Amino acid sequence: MSRVKWRNEKIIVALGSLWILGFAAWAFLLFDLLGTSVKEGILEGPREGVFWTAAQYRNSFSRFERQLILYATRQDRDFDNVLLQLDSLEASFGFLERPSEVSAYWLSIPKARDDIAELSRFMATLRRDVPALGARAGDSRRVLEDVARHWPKVNALANYFRAIEMEQRDFTFHQLKEKRRAIVMLGGVLGVILGALFLLLFYTIRTRGSLLEQQQAALDAQRKASDRAFEMIAAKNAFLGMVSHELRTPLQAICGSIEVLLARPQSDANMKTIKRLQNSAASLEAQVKDLTDYIKLRSTNRSVQSDPVEIAPLLADVLDPLRGRIRDKHLNASLRVEPPDLVVKSDRKLIQQIASNLVENSIKYTNSGTIAISAELAGTPSNRTMQIAVRDTGVGIAKNLLSKIFEPFFRVNDPGVRHVDGIGMGLAVVQELVVALRGHVDVRSVVGEGSEFVVTLPVELPGSADAPDDDAPPSLQTTHRDLHALVVDDNENARETLGAMLTALGIRADLRGTGKEGLRCFGECQHDIVVLDLELPDISGFEVAEQIRWATSPDAAKKTTILGVSAYESAMLKGDHAVFDAFVPKPIHLDTLNGIVSRLRS
């Protein structure tokens, strides 16, 4: 069976080669016949018409001669008619002389070139002598003799062109018939070879036809499913992005109101209630942040910074705001950096977000024991890497789920962890950030014992000139009794909350809902601080800020501080940034607002 198959394959190859060679020859003949502009020119002649142009000149020559006879015999004494026919004759001859497809065609023929050159000299004589006949009509007969002497050459030139055209058409038509016959014969041979080839191919692959159809159907179904999946992912990302951004404004009212309450004296019972509200709001804010970050990472190409980063202080900054949750769950947390003064060149914000998400994930799924965060330098001097590890004694992850935990919205469907808050986006964000830094993340986990996430990132060691800034940030004020602020936000809850937060900082606040109202209020009392929403219903926050800047002198001793806020981070990328002193995404926290005001007003 294999010998027959091998013989069939050799026959197929031989017949296929013959058919390809024959088809190439057939295609060349067909292209030579129909596809080239040279053959088309030979068949049709120039598109302007060789004989037609010469015939027009002959007709004009005849009319000029007849008009000149009438003038010479005084049958028509109007000399303008002679000049009119001369102009017509010159125009007709101009078509012969001027560079064109036609002139290029016949000037390549020696006889035609010589005749046209002689007629050109004769036309020059006519242009010189004929205008003088108006005053000396008696010279008309001499000119008529010259015209009559050149008439045979004009007539012969037209007839010559006609003969050339006819001869070329006959020759080309003969070639056309010969090539057509060759094409038909070669096509017949190719058809026979192709038929034999197809029969042999059908005989060889008849058992594979059904399988190929099934495979094609499966590929089509997969492609359609893939297209639908991409469309659904794009629609989902757009929807989730919109939802996450729309949640930021009500979160501003929730978080801000809670922090204002916490800034006031409260009873123990009220404090417990407010703390529960704060924890729930923080959980909701974290979920919205994860969702927004993931959509932003998937929708845009994030630029990665490379600045000196002190790892120990960075990880301490990650751990400090989470110590309250760690303490509430009675966990122990440790931090180790090797070497302790490790400084690398990388993107500080991305590393901080990676570490923060991993630590928060461990806190969620660890009910007792420890959470250990470590960072160490690894690799070789030419290929430095940094490993950040977060190890916990939590519930652990089953092996069959390790490949899924970095998928968006994935949550372990286990009774022991169903109570854990979250939408399954924290690790998906980690994966996207690690990829952005050209690193990778590994997971080791045992159910009931805990998990360890190890992030490996390529880094560089900074030189002496790249040392991080050791200057301590300025101390923040807690009250600003002498300041007067203007809050412009179309959302009433957010506006009232921002006003209450400023009041909690000791700042008097005026509240307005539109850009025009805000400008009117600022015109009545130039404020020290303007908290301005970028998306206002009448005019944009950028326009409001520009008008405020125009209304105040840049040399004034008391310059107005303008703070731009928005639920949409993309809105902060538009407009003129120079008119704002700072941008803050919603929700704004009280300590953040206090820090910004202190820094900008110091």
Swiss-Prot record:
<dbReference type="InterPro" id="IPR036097">
    <property type="entry name" value="HisK_dim/P_sf"/>
</dbReference>
<keyword id="KW-0472">Membrane</keyword>
<protein>
    <recommendedName>
        <fullName>Sensor histidine kinase AtsR</fullName>
        <ecNumber>2.7.13.3</ecNumber>
    </recommendedName>
</protein>
<dbReference type="InterPro" id="IPR011006">
    <property type="entry name" value="CheY-like_superfamily"/>
</dbReference>
<feature type="domain" description="Response regulatory">
    <location>
        <begin position="484"/>
        <end position="601"/>
    </location>
</feature>
<keyword id="KW-0597">Phosphoprotein</keyword>
<keyword id="KW-0808">Transferase</keyword>
<feature type="modified residue" description="4-aspartylphosphate">
    <location>
        <position position="533"/>
    </location>
</feature>
<dbReference type="Pfam" id="PF00072">
    <property type="entry name" value="Response_reg"/>
</dbReference>
<dbReference type="InterPro" id="IPR001789">
    <property type="entry name" value="Sig_transdc_resp-reg_receiver"/>
</dbReference>
<feature type="modified residue" description="Phosphohistidine; by autocatalysis">
    <location>
        <position position="245"/>
    </location>
</feature>
<keyword id="KW-1003">Cell membrane</keyword>
<dbReference type="InterPro" id="IPR004358">
    <property type="entry name" value="Sig_transdc_His_kin-like_C"/>
</dbReference>
<keyword id="KW-0812">Transmembrane</keyword>
<keyword id="KW-0997">Cell inner membrane</keyword>
<dbReference type="InterPro" id="IPR005467">
    <property type="entry name" value="His_kinase_dom"/>
</dbReference>
<dbReference type="Pfam" id="PF00512">
    <property type="entry name" value="HisKA"/>
</dbReference>
<dbReference type="GO" id="GO:0000155">
    <property type="term" value="F:phosphorelay sensor kinase activity"/>
</dbReference>
<dbReference type="GO" id="GO:0005886">
    <property type="term" value="C:plasma membrane"/>
</dbReference>
<feature type="transmembrane region" description="Helical">
    <location>
        <begin position="182"/>
        <end position="202"/>
    </location>
</feature>
<keyword id="KW-0902">Two-component regulatory system</keyword>
<dbReference type="Pfam" id="PF02518">
    <property type="entry name" value="HATPase_c"/>
</dbReference>
<comment type="function">
    <text>Member of a two-component regulatory system involved in control of gene expression; inhibits synthesis of (at least) the polyketide antibiotic thailandamide. Its two-component partner may be BTH_I0635.</text>
</comment>
<keyword id="KW-0418">Kinase</keyword>
<feature type="domain" description="Histidine kinase">
    <location>
        <begin position="242"/>
        <end position="461"/>
    </location>
</feature>
<dbReference type="GO" id="GO:0009927">
    <property type="term" value="F:histidine phosphotransfer kinase activity"/>
</dbReference>
<dbReference type="InterPro" id="IPR036890">
    <property type="entry name" value="HATPase_C_sf"/>
</dbReference>
<dbReference type="InterPro" id="IPR003661">
    <property type="entry name" value="HisK_dim/P_dom"/>
</dbReference>
<feature type="transmembrane region" description="Helical">
    <location>
        <begin position="11"/>
        <end position="31"/>
    </location>
</feature>
<keyword id="KW-1133">Transmembrane helix</keyword>
